From Swiss-Prot:
It comes from Acetivibrio thermocellus (strain ATCC 27405 / DSM 1237 / JCM 9322 / NBRC 103400 / NCIMB 10682 / NRRL B-4536 / VPI 7372). GO terms for biological process: phenylalanyl-tRNA aminoacylation. It is found in: Cytoplasm. Pfam families: Phe_tRNA-synt_N, tRNA-synt_2d. Its EC number is 6.1.1.20. SUPFAM superfamilies: Class II aaRS and biotin synthetases, tRNA-binding arm. One of its GO terms (molecular function) is ATP binding. Keywords: Aminoacyl-tRNA synthetase, ATP-binding, Cytoplasm, Ligase, Magnesium, Metal-binding, Nucleotide-binding, Protein biosynthesis. Mg(2+) binds at residue 254. Belongs to the class-II aminoacyl-tRNA synthetase family. Phe-tRNA synthetase alpha subunit type 1 subfamily. The gene is pheS. This is Phenylalanine--tRNA ligase alpha subunit. It catalyses: tRNA(Phe) + L-phenylalanine + ATP = L-phenylalanyl-tRNA(Phe) + AMP + diphosphate + H(+). CDD domains: PheRS_alpha_core.
Length: 339
């Protein structure tokens, strides 16, 4: 039996010296140390030994088991180290290769235009004012010299929540709130979302953005308004941009005007974008109506002011030559990543 045990040790050593994988190593372990392994089979025959031989053979068997277990563990560690090295060689990193570029977010074209408008007017000393989008009828209409029978109050144009509360149709209510709570001089712009019951098409949306401006002080004139709008147009659309004013009517300003800029695409010679007119309407403006000043507790005999308002979507469409407003809201990455 001693010869059998020594033979098992020699045979196991030979096989362990040539093992190449973890799977082969496991097969060797089972072959010699498993429940039906060769070493286990020899130990089962110890019952036939004499009492004197059993301790000697038992000690030898335990030494051989311990030796085989130790060699298996050594071989396992070597194989793991070898496999790790081979994996690193296969997956070598070329540090000279360019890295994977991450997708970075960009500003939405509407945000770009709003920020540009803010920068222009902040540079002229204006402050930013904001107000609620869910507004009282008084601030949205009455305080702006729009009586209850005025067409602008038609339910077809306005989203009413109840008879006294609505979604603001313009950012003008912010101007009223500022004039109520601040004494002149006042110099503000009011950017924000507004709501009107319009069908969605290439140039209309029930939700859109406006930026309105207000200046109230002693001695403010129409000339100040024209100069301000000229600086704004040149800053936003380029130094060669010209403006023109056409008489118009707004309930909250008097006199009032629609303001056009020379076409940014053709420079005023006429093209498809400006419908061959050379001019594109961008905003409405005028001198603040005396009744509006009075409602806010400002004496129109002492103070005067001007106001203006423009649609951000249409300005962005002109700024970036976009021909359909709906593109601004469809969240198509192929479109938005151009800006």
């Amino acid at each position: 039996m001693k010869e059998q045990l020594n033979s098992i040790r020699v045979q196991a050593e030979q096989e362990l010296s040539n093992v190449g994988t973890i799977a082969e190593l496991e097969n060797i372990r089972v072959k010699y140390l498993g429940k039906k392994g060769e070493l286990t089979a020899v130990l089962r025959g110890m019952g036939s030994l004499s009492p004197e031989e059993r301790p000697v053979i038992g000690q030898l068997a335990n030494e051989i088991r311990a030796y085989i277990e130790s060699r298996i563990e050594e071989a396992r560690n070597e194989l793991i180290k070898k496999e790790r090295s081979q994996k690193l060689e296969r997956e070598v990193i070329d540090v000279t290769m360019p890295g994977k570029r991450k997708m970075l977010g960009k500003k939405h074209p509407l945000s770009i235009v709003i920020d540009e408008i803010k920068d222009v007017f902040i540079g002229m000393g204006y402050e930013i004012a904001e107000g609620p989008e869910v507004e009282l009828d008084y601030y949205n209409f009455e305080a702006l010299n729009i009586p209850r029978n005025h067409p602008a109050r038609d339910v077809q144009d306005t989203f009413y929540i109840n008879n006294n509360i609505l979604l603001r149709t313009q950012t003008s209510p912010v101007q009223i709130r500022v004039m109520e709570n601040k004494k002149p001089p006042i110099k503000i712009i009011c950017p924000g979302r507004v709501y009107r019951s319009d069908a969605v098409d290439a140039t209309h949306s029930p939700i859109f953005h406006q930026v309105e401006g207000l200046v109230v002080d002693k001695g403010v004139t129409m000339g100040d308004l024209v100069g301000t709008l000229r600086v704004f147009a040149k800053s936003l659309f380029g130094e060669k941009t010209e403006i023109r004013l056409r008489p118009h009517h707004f309930p909250f300003t008097e006199p009032s005007a629609e303001v056009d800029v020379s076409c940014w695409a053709c420079g005023g010679t006429g093209c498809r974008i400006c419908k061959n007119e050379g001019w594109i309407e961008i905003l409405g403006a005028g001198m603040v109506h005396p009744k509006v000043l009075e409602v806010c507790g400002i004496d129109p005999e002492v103070y005067s002011g001007f106001a203006f308002g423009l649609g951000v979507e249409r300005t962005a469409m002109g700024r970036f030559n976009i021909d359909d407003m709906r593109l601004l809201y469809e969240n198509d990455i192929r479109f938005l990543k151009q800006f």
